[in-house]
């Protein structure tokens, strides 16, 4: 099953200790978050256009990505901040609900290209 979600992948790397907890600060930057999801959408679309992914797979990935953004992104954002703080690294960032909306709308726009 195709599922591309760079934010979730990078968060997992930090929690598993594969990446330094200091990386969480960069990961939680709102511009970086938007760029990761934009890049994921482009990668998914390119897989479809190149014939490496079926239409159904791509549509499902967009659906799952949008569902993640709307229902889980802010929760994981806060959990990663808490995790970093438990390791002695305080992060003072907040996730603006408008960023979540922008990402969801972007996914909608790209999804229409399939």
UniProtKB/Swiss-Prot annotation:
Gene3D superfamilies per the UniProt record, alphabetical: AF0941-like
InterPro entries recorded: AF0941-like_sf, Uncharacterised_AF0941
Domain of life: Archaea
Pfam families in alphabetical order: AF0941-like
Official protein name in the record: Uncharacterized protein AF_0941
Species of the source: Archaeoglobus fulgidus (strain ATCC 49558 / DSM 4304 / JCM 9628 / NBRC 100126 / VC-16)
């Amino acid at each position: 099953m195709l599922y591309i979600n760079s934010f979730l992948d990078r968060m997992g790397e930090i929690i598993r200790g594969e990446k330094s907890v200091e990386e969480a600060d960069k990961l939680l930057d709102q511009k970086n978050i938007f760029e990761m999801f934009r890049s994921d959408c482009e990668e998914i679309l390119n897989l479809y256009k190149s014939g490496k992914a079926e239409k159904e797979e791509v549509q499902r990935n967009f659906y799952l990505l949008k569902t993640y953004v709307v229902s889980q992104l802010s929760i994981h954002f806060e959990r990663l901040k808490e995790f970093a703080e438990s390791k002695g690294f305080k992060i003072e960032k907040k996730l603006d609900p408008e960023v979540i909306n922008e990402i969801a709308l972007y996914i909608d726009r790209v999804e229409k290209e399939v």
